[in-house]
Structure formats: C-alpha cells, structure tokens
Amino acid sequence: MHIMVTNDDGIQAPGIQALASALRVLGEVTVVAPDRERSAVGHALTLNSPLRVFELRDGFYAVDGTPTDCVNMGIHSLLPFRPDLIVSGINHGANLGDDVTYSGTVAAAIEATLMGIPAIAVSLATQERSGHFPEAAQIAVRVARQVLSNGLPEDTFLNVNVPDCPAEEIRPPLVTRQGKRSFVGNVIDKTDPRGRKYYWIGSGEADFNDYEGTDFHAINRKHVSITPLHLDLTNYASMKVITTWVF
C-alpha cells in the first residue's frame, strides 16, 4: 500500500510527524506538505506563481504552496506511484461544522477525492501547543485501515476529529453529521503608529449548536467524530422550489 500524507500546519508540525510515523504500519508513506503554516487557506490553488519543492529527507517533500498544491504536486510530479490513500493532518485544532469550508486540511482531502483517491482529513480538537498527537495518530491508523479495506462511496471522504485526551479517555468513534458554528464579532480594527488602519480577522468568539448526532456533540463528550462528507453541494430539495420561479 502507498499512502501520501499532507497537512496545512506545515511539514515540521508535530501532527504530521506523528501521523506519518504511525501510518507506516499500513504501507509506504510519502509526505508532501507546505513548507510553512497554511491554516485556513481553504481550497486555494496556486496558478499565478511557480512552486518550489525541497526534499528535506527521503520521502519528505516541502512545497512552498497550499495543501491543494501539495496534493497536485505529489500525485502529478513527486510520487512514482498513484497513492492508495491520502491522509491530511493531524491538524492542530478541530475542524468541525462550518470550519470545513475554511480548512486547508479538509481541502487537501477534497482535492484527493476530486482525483478519485480515497482520502481522510484528521484533526485534533486542541488549542494546546503539545496535544495528544500520538493518540490521534493511532485513531487515524484505525480509520485508514478500514478505508483501505472497504473503500469509500464515490465523491466521499471522511472528516475525522479526535478529542485531546489520553488514549484511555477517548470514547468509541461515532459516525456524525456536520454541525453548525456561528461567529460573533470576528473582525477587529486597529491603528498602527503611522495612523493607518489594519484589521485582524478570526479573533472573535465562536459558538456552536450542541445537537445530538453532530460532530460537536461527539467531540464535547470525548468521542471520536467521523463525518462522511461529499463533494456534491447541490440542495436537491430546493431545486423543486426554485424551478417554479420565473426568471
């Protein structure tokens, strides 16, 4: 088995190091990841500037681009084989609910899915500098083993979130639906010493709906959350209503 690993926290992040090491029990692992942190870049693809690749050591490639760039570089240029699985992570911080629309970690799994390769996005629900990444890596191995054995439905990947706690405290995985997060006041404006305005985005408070069956509900109770996500964003129920409109 050939497995490619990427992330959005950068190739030196502890999460990707733990993940790559753990996945070697399943087969050959190649890491193709951003050369620095690229969190919250979404599904960005670099089209207007060249990309550079640095081989840090055997099987570890740093790309000066986004997670989506890394998937493309790995599949079309760097890997001598088409991977059987692409695993993105382990992200430093949860990717729950609406977070997935911003996440570079999830975007890498989306890109792999677009290319017809089974994919998993893995995140650790922590804000601590040193979270339980080895424990999350072992969860990733268990999920990866199932995907390699059973495959995934077409246009579907798995978004896995792991609670940040010792292995003995992690409760059994739950298959969940995507929850809903709401952000309040997440833009702050400041003035620099020269009197010019500048802004910070993302520093506001975030709330979420803790509904049973959601990824939030599972993580808050120390369960592993496994959410199958698919690429077809069509709202089929709304199609019937909108077809009655007069354009």
From Swiss-Prot:
Transmembrane segments: none annotated. It is found in: Cytoplasm. Keywords: Cytoplasm, Hydrolase, Metal-binding, Nucleotide-binding. It catalyses: a ribonucleoside 5'-phosphate + H2O = a ribonucleoside + phosphate. GO terms for cellular component: cytoplasm. It is an enzyme of class 3 (hydrolase). Coiled coil: none annotated. Pfam families: SurE. The keyword Cytoplasm applies. Its main location: cytoplasm. GO terms for molecular function: 3'-nucleotidase activity; 5'-nucleotidase activity; exopolyphosphatase activity; metal ion binding; nucleotide binding. Binds 1 divalent metal cation per subunit. Its cofactor is a divalent metal cation. A divalent metal cation binds at residues 8-9, 39, 91. Its EC number is 3.1.3.5. Belongs to the SurE nucleotidase family. HAMAP family: SurE (MF_00060). NCBIfam families: PRK00346.1-3, PRK00346.1-4, PRK00346.2-2, surE. Nucleotidase that shows phosphatase activity on nucleoside 5'-monophosphates. This is 5'-nucleotidase SurE.
